[in-house]
């Protein structure tokens, strides 16, 4: 992928520009939220912090409302981005999908294999194999934004496209590997609601209200069905009509995406980060850091991501299946591959799904994610800053 598609219309270009800007700024806010959570969790306020998260409201803990409710809005945003990019954006043609597609596949496979190798023989911890397989688009773009305008737009678009495809892979993994104890009547109700949403799309209903009301109903049914509730957000997004290029001024999808971006970037994701990054470091020793879970997560993110993304990209380019992003070189591409190891939001999210009955393992996941993502952010920014300072 070398540039934004020529098929993309002016409003689509504006949406992409705002997307990159808000995701970058949102990533910085997310960093602050994560740091604040770490400080609070290791201060005199820690008891209040964890007490609030575990307090129950309307049958669910505050933590579950955030992870199952607010994150459904995040996944709605992810679904809207995927649909826009595939229909009229940077993933509109197979040629544009090739490089981020191969890179995303490699960047999911290698980290998972590293985690599996380190946790082999332990069925309980092996279920966390998907934790290091995701890239946090907000965090990664936020770190990349620290270099300012020195970074070619093509590299930013490549990273955004890769992370979007990465999210699509993560959604698929959650659907197939982290859903259990299915409630068939509720699942049938969810499919019936989804069928109505699809019918609205086919009938070219362009008012958002019916979609949003049915989407809320879909979320409830999916929550009760045993399938993870956040998938309702993705399903709803795929049903909201994009419209033809000449109708983009009235596109429900673009309108909703524009309205949601800042709320997701500056509220939903930081709240999730603050609620999930807090881990008490008391009692954690160097010996704990080499336990299979934190070691597998940290090495999967920091080592596995850069190897998987860069190797897959090199093979695709050398085979003539893709081209190097415009105005970039191999070292810069490698720097971006390192940044793909920032897996904060989705990695923490999958960690909660992988170990629902063990706070100890969830805390180990948090430590591994913080170390792996931190190393990836530092190494990536140092390499890219050194490289760009020479030009």
Curated annotation (Swiss-Prot):
**Keyword flag Ion transport:** yes
Membrane topology according to the record: Multi-pass membrane protein
Report the GO molecular function annotations: sodium:proton antiporter activity
- What GO terms fall under cellular component here? plasma membrane
Listed under GO biological process in this entry are: regulation of pH
Biological source species: Pseudomonas savastanoi pv. phaseolicola (strain 1448A / Race 6) (Pseudomonas syringae pv. phaseolicola (strain 1448A / Race 6))
Against PANTHER family, the record matches this protein to: NA(+)_H(+) ANTIPORTER NHAA (PTHR30341:SF0), SODIUM ION/PROTON ANTIPORTER NHAA-RELATED (PTHR30341)
User: Which transformation does this protein catalyse, written as a reaction?
Assistant: Na(+)(in) + 2 H(+)(out) = Na(+)(out) + 2 H(+)(in)
Give the UniProt family note. Answer: Belongs to the NhaA Na(+)/H(+) (TC 2.A.33) antiporter family.
The residue stretches assigned to a coiled coil in this entry are: none
Q: What is the protein name for this chain? A: Na(+)/H(+) antiporter NhaA 1
Residue ranges spanning the membrane: these are: 19-39, 56-76, 98-118, 128-148, 157-177, 180-200, 208-228, 264-284, 297-317, 335-355, 364-384
